């Protein structure tokens, strides 16, 4: 996925280029540069790019184009339209300039703004600390699940602690109102803006229920870390992992596995047989 970089990309990309593995997940980060640190005066240092990584098909996985900078000095990713096509050992087309694209893409669900606040606020860890005092023992990582009762208890705890969060839509609406006021539209359309603002105002009860499944996953993760540490958290997370499920599906279907590794023309012929 997007957190996979450097060595992970080189290994997975090489296996893909040699048609020795089927990749499942999201596109990787795209770090294809070799950098070496150099010391500077006054305890400073700088990383100097020494070379680039190229994998068996001849492609480079580097995503950010540092050779072409914008007017403000910033850099951008190489657009897909400017990437080149390369071929695996069996003739499957693959592209450079943007990390490793898996053979089976599994989209990651979007994370609402509220979830970021829950993950960075101490309210989650504080609740689990209290919860653990009432639950000296819990089920194994393979069997443990957060109940609806636990979810409701956490929601009530958040209310009592006056948990608050900002929403991007609310910020954008505020900016839009300022622009509308500057351009003279607020006098005529203030009622419309007020109505929209009311709908976009954070509602903890509504937003908790709307994101119930993701919040229960967060709670489960925090509880697992407290009782079974990182290993237990990982074992528990595999119970509901779309990437793992797809990988097991592909591994359990030899025909699909082989067809995925074939060149497009041959794969089409095989599928029709």
Residue ranges and their predicted role:
Residues 1, 14, 22-24, 45-52, ...:
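Soluble periplasmic/extracytoplasmic beta-strand elements of cell-envelope proteins
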Residues 1-41, 52, 236:
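Cleft-lining beta-strand/loop regions that shape enzyme active-site pockets
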Residues 2, 21, 45-46, 78, ...:
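Alpha-helical protein-protein interaction elements
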Residues 31-35, 55, 61-68:
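Short, positively charged
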């Amino acid at each position: 996925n997007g957190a996979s970089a450097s060595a992970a990309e080189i290994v997975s990309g090489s296996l893909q280029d040699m048609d020795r593995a089927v990749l499942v997940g999201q596109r990787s980060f795209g770090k294809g540069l070799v950098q070496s640190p150099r010391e500077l005066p006054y305890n400073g240092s700088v990383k100097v790019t020494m070379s680039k990584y190229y994998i068996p098909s001849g492609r480079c996985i580097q995503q950010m184009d540092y050779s072409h900078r914008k007017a403000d000095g910033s850099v951008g990713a190489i657009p897909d339209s400017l990437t080149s096509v390369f071929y695996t050992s069996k003739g499957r087309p693959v592209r450079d300039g943007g990390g490793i694209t898996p053979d089976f893409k599994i989209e990651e669900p979007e994370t609402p703004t509220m979830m970021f606040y829950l993950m960075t606020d101490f309210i989650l860890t504080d609740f689990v600390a209290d919860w653990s005092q009432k639950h000296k023992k819990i089920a194994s990582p393979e069997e443990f699940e957060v109940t609806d009762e636990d979810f409701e208890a956490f929601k009530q705890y958040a209310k009592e602690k006056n948990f608050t969060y900002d929403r991007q839509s609310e910020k954008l609406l505020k900016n839009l109102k300022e622009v509308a006021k500057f351009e003279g539209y607020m006098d005529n359309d203030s009622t419309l803006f007020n109505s929209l603002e009311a709908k976009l105002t954070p509602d903890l009860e509504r937003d908790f229920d709307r994101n119930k499944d993701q919040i229960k996953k967060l709670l489960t993760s925090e509880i697992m870390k407290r009782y079974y540490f990182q290993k237990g958290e990982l074992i528990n997370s595999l119970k509901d992992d779309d990437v793992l499920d797809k990988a097991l599906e592909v591994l359990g279907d030899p025909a699909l596995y082989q067809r995925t590794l074939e060149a497009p023309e041959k794969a089409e012929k095989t599928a029709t047989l």
